[in-house]
């Protein structure tokens, strides 16, 4: 079970690496390719509470982008590599990693408050609770209206089908719904950027529709409408604040499911005795199914597909795509959290239980009468609603230098350093692998003696040299072996005889 792992505000001791947020354009990628690099995000939801950190190196061993180092006994998060997947939150035994997001009272700054519940929210409740009750419960928490992200997932499904049906496109297409996966591609697999399906994630589509409809319904300006996402993971919190592929945010904040679940559960219980619902259910069961791994593919149901969940499994699939082994596929649903969004670190329910509930809801939930079909709704909408606004670019993360010549020189030095390291990947140096330590040394962020094995070998060599030096005499005092024996005999002969 993934328990609550949130923080409403950033503690003074919550920090990131010393070079946080500093990147440069036109950098050399980790594989030697020169890319036009995007400036790294200035905001990350995942933070370190330094006072709790024991320097145990669990986080550095599990981070999929090697974005964490342990320096002076404390972890540091490197902004340029962090994808906010939350793996460090999941594995830290000291709860030194946390996620920052908005508190529920943040909605009070707006005249009209709209909630965007993630489909994963429905999986947090037991089987007797229908999504209708959850939507109504949100009104009791201070929201004026609700727009289901699952409804937007129904619309996005239609656009994805259209992309798959196109001819002459690069294959396989990779889902853009998981922001941690999109950032993983930016950071670690820049050659796969063109594989990302050019369709917005459901949460952004939902936000744009919800703001427009609320402004019209309540007669207010769009900027007077506060649109808040109920998020299952820190990656989506970051994506809302620092969206990739867009000119700016479409939402006003994100509230962790773990934070809102308690008051929402009480509101749902209080409403059980009431008949009817105030909020119309507009999503289909297939839209709700996007909350679990395989749900997106079930909804799209077109072409040759695979679904992969768990960030380390995703990395394995992406490596195969780079090698050309999966060119026969049409679509890859890739989710960083095991089990899908129901496995996010900002949820409260066991991911396996929640996944089962979502699967049941996929069959049970239907939109109410009068709701247009997704196909009808999409035909009436501007195509720009579903498109990225700017190209997605690689992030300067594994770059060794700013130009190819210097990068090659540093790569040669890196290989020489790596040859002298033990290759044990023990993490005692504060880097996750020997390769990562060699990269840090080349960048001037570490030294070879940070490796305990290199340090021990040098100490042993120094001790041996000191032993040899201690036996040596200055040249003026030096005598050959024959001369030393002759002097010893003469001393013995000069001794007085014993009487």
Locations of the language-model features?
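Compositionally biased, low-complexity flexible segments
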Residues: 1-31
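Iron-sulfur cluster-binding cysteine motifs and their immediate structural context
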Residues: 38-50, 54-78, 83, 87-102, ...
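Iron-sulfur-associated redox domains of electron-transfer enzymes in respiratory
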Residues: 30-36, 95-428, 432-499
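Generic detector of N-terminal low-structure segments
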Residues: 21, 36-37
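Generic recognition of cysteine residues
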Residues: 2, 56, 85-88, 178, ...
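Generic detector of short alpha-helix boundary/capping microenvironments
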Residues: 17, 41, 51, 325, ...
């Amino acid at each position: 079970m993934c328990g609550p792992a949130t923080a409403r505000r950033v503690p003074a001791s919550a920090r990131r690496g010393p070079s946080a947020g500093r990147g440069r354009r036109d950098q050399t990628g980790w594989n030697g390719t020169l890319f036009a690099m995007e400036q790294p995000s200035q905001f990350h939801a995942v933070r370190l509470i330094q006072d709790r950190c024991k320097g145990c190196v669990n986080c550095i061993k599990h981070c999929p982008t090697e974005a964490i180092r342990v320096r002076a006994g404390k972890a540091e998060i490197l902004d340029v590599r962090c994808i906010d997947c939350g793996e460090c939150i999941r594995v830290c035994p000291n709860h030194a990693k946390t996620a920052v997001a908005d508190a529920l009272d943040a909605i009070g700054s707006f005249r009209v408050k709209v909630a965007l519940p993630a489909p994963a929210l429905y999986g947090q409740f037991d089987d007797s609770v229908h999504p209708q009750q959850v939507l109504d419960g949100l009104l009791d928490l201070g929201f004026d209206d609700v727009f289901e992200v699952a409804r937007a997932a129904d619309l996005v499904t239609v656009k994805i089908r259209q992309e798959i049906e196109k001819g002459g496109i690069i294959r396989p297409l990779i889902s853009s719904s998981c922001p941690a996966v999109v950032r993983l591609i930016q950071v670690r697999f820049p050659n796969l950027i063109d594989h990302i399906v050019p369709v917005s994630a459901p949460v952004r589509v939902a936000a744009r529709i919800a703001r427009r409809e609320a402004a019209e319904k309540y007669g207010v300006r769009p900027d007077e409408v506060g649109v808040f996402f109920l998020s299952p993971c820190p990656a989506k919190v970051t994506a809302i604040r620092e969206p990739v592929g867009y000119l700016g945010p479409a939402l006003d904040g994100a509230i962790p499911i773990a934070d809102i679940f308690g008051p929402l559960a009480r509101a749902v219980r209080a409403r059980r005795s009431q008949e009817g619902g105030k909020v119309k259910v507009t999503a289909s069961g297939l839209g709700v199914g996007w909350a679990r791994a395989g749900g997106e593919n079930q909804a799209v149901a077109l072409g040759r597909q695979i679904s992969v969940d768990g960030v380390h499994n995703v990395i394995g699939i992406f490596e195969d795509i780079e090698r050309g082994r999966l060119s026969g596929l049409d679509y890859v649903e890739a989710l960083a959290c095991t089990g899908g969004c129901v496995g996010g670190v900002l949820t409260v329910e066991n991911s396996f239980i929640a996944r089962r509930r979502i699967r049941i809801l996929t069959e049970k939930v239907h939109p109410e009468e009068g709701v247009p079909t997704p196909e009808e709704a999409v035909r009436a909408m501007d195509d720009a609603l579903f498109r990225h606004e700017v190209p997605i670019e690689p992030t300067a993360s594994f770059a060794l230098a700013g130009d190819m010549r210097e990068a090659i020189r540093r790569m040669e030095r890196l290989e020489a350093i790596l040859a002298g390291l033990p290759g044990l990947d023990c993490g005692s140096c504060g880097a996750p692998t020997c390769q990562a330590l060699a990269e840090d040394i080349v960048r001037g962020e570490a030294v070879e003696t940070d490796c305990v094995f290199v340090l021990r070998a040098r100490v042993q060599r120094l001790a041996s040299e000191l032993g040899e030096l201690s036996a040596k005499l200055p040249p003026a005092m030096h005598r050959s072996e024959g001369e030393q024996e002759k002097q010893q005999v003469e001393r013995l002969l000069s001794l007085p005889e014993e009487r």
